[in-house]
Amino acid sequence: MFAIAILAAGKGTRMRSSYPKVLQQLAGRSLIKRVIKSCEDLKPDRFLVIVGHQAEAVQDHLKELSHLEYINQVPQKGTGHAIQQLLPVLDNFIGDLLVLNGDVPLLKAETLQKLIAKHKTSKASVTFLSARLSNPKGYGRVFSNNQDEVDRIVEDADCSREEKSNKLTNAGIYLFKWDLLKNILPKLSSTNKQSELYLTDAISQLPTAIHLEVDNIDEVSGVNDRAQLANCENLIQQSLRNHWMSKGVSFIDPESCTISEESQFGIDIVIEPQTHLRGNCFIGNNCRLGPSTYIEDSRLGENVNVMQSTLNNCQVASHVKIGPFAHLRPETNVSSNCRIGNFVEIKKSELGQGTKVNHLSYIGDSHVGCHVNIGAGTITANFDGFRKNETVIGDHTKTGANSVLIAPINIGNRVTVGAGSTLTKNVPDGSLAIERSKQNIKENWKTREETNQ
């Protein structure tokens, strides 16, 4: 049998955060979800998460993963103490236990497969990952022979000056034979500078220990503070950009752009500087995004041009131009061949094919037909102080500049709305709707300053 245990009980004090370290985000996904994803194909018989600090928050974050089991570690007295909590849970378990850290988010499934393969061929009591670091400060040192057989692991705080010169470090990823480990766990001692129970102390007490040195040390990079979090974010973003550039996406200034792992792209896409994609996005062929554009949870068809704009939870069809400085809010659906210009905000609305909203307008809770021209400064006044009301604008309708449509209202097909009109009543098809106050001109008018002279 095969079990996995993820250590996720720590406070992460160096992160200076109000929520658990394992819930920090990288490219839109938490550290712990990244760790879980790295081993989801291993198909364990038991999948355990050891929680402690803000345990409820961690469990709530993972609530959709019903196959996980949770074990509380209170208080937190080190990695050895964490695994001790498994003794009653795995009392009758026979097999291998893979121990992972919830704050090591870049680990690849292929590396874990290599670890498992070496463990099986060596028949060792424990096989673990190691990394050779140029600056090993803070990491436990691994002392082994040329056959990768490990004599001991010494934590950094307990290393002598000579031992600190060793650059081979413990990556904290272990594969144990559980029937051997469970007999050693109760014997662990906290006689060390940290006064904690180290899981590494169990290794020297096991019959055989083997280490596997990783090819890429970035995979075992831990996240303990904001600087390390930023470093991991940069590594992920670089990997994502390189992947999509190999698939036909151009980044004008790659390092200024960020994308989520859920984002998908077609080909011949150009992404300008300072463009950011979050959540589940799909970008069709021949699109051009940016510069200075933010897109979240949105789907864009082919040949869409978005410049200096924000899109959130939108559906945009093909051959649409958006921006600069447009804001498309959730539940906005834009049909093909539309034009949305500068300083336009659209919320929870549908725009029919070929419709233009070129400048300085707010369209909210509206159904706008095909080939409609929304004049500059047109506003759909959708909120009456109690509820949001709907505006319907028919096909081939034109609204003049500075029009206000007070919802609920239905403007028919082929309607012309005169500039400066404020409409409160429905307008039938083929009509001219105009509502203005009478223009009043007073000739020879003098200002107050002129009158006082």
Curated annotation (Swiss-Prot):
Note describing how the cofactor binds: Binds 1 Mg(2+) ion per subunit.
Positions annotated to bind Mg(2+): D103, N224
EC number(s) stated in the UniProt entry for this protein: 2.7.7.23, 2.3.1.157
Active site: H359 (proton acceptor)
Pfam families tied to this protein: Hexapep (PF00132), NTP_transferase (PF00483)
Catalytic reaction(s) noted: alpha-D-glucosamine 1-phosphate + acetyl-CoA = N-acetyl-alpha-D-glucosamine 1-phosphate + CoA + H(+); N-acetyl-alpha-D-glucosamine 1-phosphate + UTP + H(+) = UDP-N-acetyl-alpha-D-glucosamine + diphosphate
Gene3D superfamilies: Hexapeptide repeat proteins (2.160.10.10), Spore Coat Polysaccharide Biosynthesis Protein SpsA, Chain A (3.90.550.10)
Annotated region (N-acetyltransferase), positions in chain: 248-453
Chain residues that bind UDP-N-acetyl-alpha-D-glucosamine: 7-10, 21, 73, 78-79, 140, 155, 170, 224, 329, 347, 362, 373
Region (Linker): 227-247
InterPro entries: Bifunctional_GlmU, GlmU-like, GlmU_C_LbH, Hexapep, NTP_transferase_dom, Nucleotide-diphossugar_trans, Trimer_LpxA-like_sf
Pathway: Nucleotide-sugar biosynthesis; UDP-N-acetyl-alpha-D-glucosamine biosynthesis; N-acetyl-alpha-D-glucosamine 1-phosphate from alpha-D-glucosamine 6-phosphate (route II): step 2/2; Nucleotide-sugar biosynthesis; UDP-N-acetyl-alpha-D-glucosamine biosynthesis; UDP-N-acetyl-alpha-D-glucosamine from N-acetyl-alpha-D-glucosamine 1-phosphate: step 1/1; Bacterial outer membrane biogenesis; LPS lipid A biosynthesis
Annotated stretches, region: Pyrophosphorylase: 1-226
GO MF terms, alphabetically ordered: glucosamine-1-phosphate N-acetyltransferase activity; magnesium ion binding; structural constituent of carboxysome shell; UDP-N-acetylglucosamine diphosphorylase activity
CDD domains linked: GT2_GlmU_N_bac, LbH_GlmU_C
Binding site for acetyl-CoA: A376, A419, R436
UniProt entry keywords in alphabetical sequence: Acyltransferase, Cell shape, Cell wall biogenesis/degradation, Cytoplasm, Magnesium, Metal-binding, Multifunctional enzyme, Nucleotidyltransferase, Peptidoglycan synthesis, Repeat, Transferase
GO cellular component: carboxysome; cytoplasm; membrane
Family: In the N-terminal section; belongs to the N-acetylglucosamine-1-phosphate uridyltransferase family.
Complex and partners: Homotrimer.
HAMAP family listed in its UniProt record: GlmU
Role description: Catalyzes the last two sequential reactions in the de novo biosynthetic pathway for UDP-N-acetylglucosamine (UDP-GlcNAc). The C-terminal domain catalyzes the transfer of acetyl group from acetyl coenzyme A to glucosamine-1-phosphate (GlcN-1-P) to produce N-acetylglucosamine-1-phosphate (GlcNAc-1-P), which is converted into UDP-GlcNAc by the transfer of uridine 5-monophosphate (from uridine 5-triphosphate), a reaction catalyzed by the N-terminal domain.
PANTHER family for the chain: BIFUNCTIONAL PROTEIN GLMU (PTHR43584:SF3), NUCLEOTIDYL TRANSFERASE (PTHR43584)
Protein name stated in the entry: Bifunctional protein GlmU
Organism, as annotated: Prochlorococcus marinus (strain MIT 9211)
